[in-house]
Swiss-Prot record:
Family: Belongs to the bacterial ribosomal protein bS16 family.
Lyase is among the record's keywords: no
Gene3D superfamilies in alphabetical order: 3.30.1320.10
GO cellular component terms, semicolon-separated: cytoplasm; small ribosomal subunit
UniProt superkingdom: Bacteria
Protein name: Small ribosomal subunit protein bS16
Gene Ontology terms, MF aspect: structural constituent of ribosome
Amino acid sequence: MIKLRLKRFGKKREASYRIVAINNLARRDGRPLEELGFYNPRTDEVRLDVPGIVKRLQQGAQPTDTVRRILVKANVFEQVSATAAS
C-alpha cells in the first residue's frame, strides 16, 4: 500500500519534512516513490504539488493523520472530489 507521509530532514532540533509517496513498509527516511511537497512546522510553511497529490490519492494512496491535516488546511480533498465528480 502507498502512503503519503512525512520524511524528516534538516539539522538536529530544526526539523523540516518532505511530504512523500512511499511504500508503507519502507523506513521513515527511506527512498520515496515521489516527493510531493514540503512542510516546516517551525514557520508553518507548506508547499504542495497539488496535481501530484490528487493523482496519488485517486490511485488509492492513504495519507497519515498529520499529512491529512495539512491537506485539509490546503483544501486538497475538495479538489480530489471535484476531479472525481467530473
